[in-house]
Regions:
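Surface-exposed, charged secondary-structure patches
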Residues: 37-86, 91-98
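Short solvent-exposed beta->alpha transition segments
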Residues: 7-8, 12-15, 19-61
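TPR-adjacent "capping" and linker segments in tetratricopeptide-repeat scaffold/adaptor proteins
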Residues: 1-4
């Protein structure tokens, strides 16, 4: 994985969540995770008003990001594993932290 490309894409993903750009958010999910998008979105505070990439760990074949999403109803931090997709990095696993 290219570190800078991955870092930029993960930040763009977090920004898309704040904008409510669900087409972009879903496109960042692996084909296996896309059907779970409604359940994943339901776990976020609504509306999401801020997303902060707290950490990003790079490895050769995947990267792990922790992103805190904040909204009117509170905040949640998610850990996501990213791998290279056909056109851009995609999320292959996501889970709440804590």
């Amino acid at each position: 994985m290219d570190e800078q490309t991955t870092k930029d894409h993960i930040q763009a993903h977090a920004d898309a969540v704040v904008r409510g750009d669900m087409d972009t958010v879903i496109a960042d999910l692996s084909a296996e995770l896309q059907p779970q998008a409604p359940q994943l979105a339901a776990g976020l505070p609504m509306p999401v008003t801020e997303a902060e990439v707290l950490s990003l760990d790079f490895a050769e074949d995947e990267s792990v990001a922790q992103i805190r999403y904040t909204g009117d109803s509170g905040a949640v931090t998610l850990r996501s594993r990213w791998q290279d997709g056909d056109e851009h990095p995609v999320i292959v696993h996501v889970e709440p932290v804590g």
